[in-house]
From Swiss-Prot:
Coiled coil: none annotated. The gene is purC. This is Phosphoribosylaminoimidazole-succinocarboxamide synthase. The keyword ATP-binding applies. It comes from Streptomyces avermitilis (strain ATCC 31267 / DSM 46492 / JCM 5070 / NBRC 14893 / NCIMB 12804 / NRRL 8165 / MA-4680). SUPFAM superfamilies: SAICAR synthase-like (SSF56104). It catalyses: 5-amino-1-(5-phospho-D-ribosyl)imidazole-4-carboxylate + L-aspartate + ATP = (2S)-2-[5-amino-1-(5-phospho-beta-D-ribosyl)imidazole-4-carboxamido]succinate + ADP + phosphate + 2 H(+). Gene3D superfamilies: ATP-grasp fold, B domain, Phosphorylase Kinase, domain 1.
Length: 299
């Protein structure tokens, strides 16, 4: 069992139609037919949307995505039309709302990996492959790969888990030409972002993108290169062979699996609320990622 511990009720905003409540984002449509994407402070872990929110998280995700979009536009156009608050929207939406093009979304999570960890490490330890791609012997948790690889995954609903799939399966789903575009653009955007992050003392271990089509044009959508969609590691603490310190929700995962939480991940019971010290530390991680990447102070 998984999903929302406490599913939020969507806000009723004049002129907007609620379309979907996701793990983090609420999606609406305005009268012009554009999408209104609102990033909440919700946090998910182990396929559960937790009952405790992380203050400012949605704003950090939105502002960091906008910062990255500006630096990637020559590689991939993005879906953002405006950051103006829709008329009648609550003040709390300020800084966490994007007005976006409505796209024909591709049913694939486009994952790029430059380092081995997470589900990729699990598969590698069993088969010496990741998504069907053969990798050399001797790699450990945190190893840098010989080169970035494209390891797509299925898109899962709230409460379900993304599943890694082969490139060949993606080509069967979306067609060879589109699959090639997805792979090429994913790896190009990853390489650009990896180099930018590296200059700021951060390793971009892996990340996932979502794409859609606006006519014949492939467009980068959703969020990009945030602590929710990426693994960011401090470069000065990188040490292959162990779990790496990170600027993301790993702190929450660690607490949930610790004796302190009292939660059994294998049970069907929902996870407990987060204590204040975990909330504060997690918020600090998200803010630090924003500040180190952008060079700007969070306020």
């Amino acid at each position: 069992m998984s999903g929302f511990v406490e599913k939020p009720e969507p806000l009723q905003v004049p002129g907007l139609v609620h379309l979907h409540t996701g793990k983090v984002r609420d999606l609406y449509q305005n009268e012009a037919g554009d999408l209104v994407m609102v990033a909440s402070d919700r946090l998910s872990a182990f396929d559960w949307v937790l009952p405790t929110e992380i203050p400012d998280k949605g704003r950090v995700l939105t502002q960091l995505s906008l910062w990255w979009f500006d630096r990637l536009v020559d590689l991939a156009p993005n879906h953002v039309l405006s950051t103006e608050l829709p008329p009648g929207a609550p003040a709390d939406w300020q800084g966490r709302t994007l007005i976006c093009k409505s796209l024909k979304m591709e049913p694939v999570e486009c994952v790029a990996r430059g380092y081995l960890t997470g589900s990729g490490l699990v598969e590698y330890n069993e088969t010496r492959t990741v998504c069907g791609l053969a990798l050399p012997e001797g790699l450990v948790d945190g190893s840098e790969l010989p080169g970035p690889i494209f390891t797509p995954a299925t898109k899962a609903a709230v409460g379900e888990h993304d599943e890694n799939v082969s490139y060949e399966e993606v080509a069967r789903q979306v067609g060879a030409e589109t699959a090639a575009k997805l792979r090429q653009t994913t790896l190009a955007v990853y390489a650009r972002a990896r180099d930018i992050a590296r200059r700021r003392g951060i390793i971009l271990a892996d990340t996932k993108f979502e794409f859609g089509f606006d006519g014949d044009t492939l467009v980068l959508a959703d969020e990009v290169l945030t602590p929710d969609s990426s693994r960011f590691w401090p470069a000065d603490q990188w040490e292959p062979g162990r779990a790496q310190p990170s600027f993301d929700k790993q702190f929450v995962r660690d607490w949930l699996t610790s004796p302190e939480s009292g939660w059994d991940r294998k049970s069907e019971q929902p996870p407990p609320p987060l204590p204040q010290h975990v909330v504060d530390a997690t918020r600090a991680k998200y803010v630090e990622a924003y500040e180190r990447l952008t060079g700007a102070n969070w306020s």
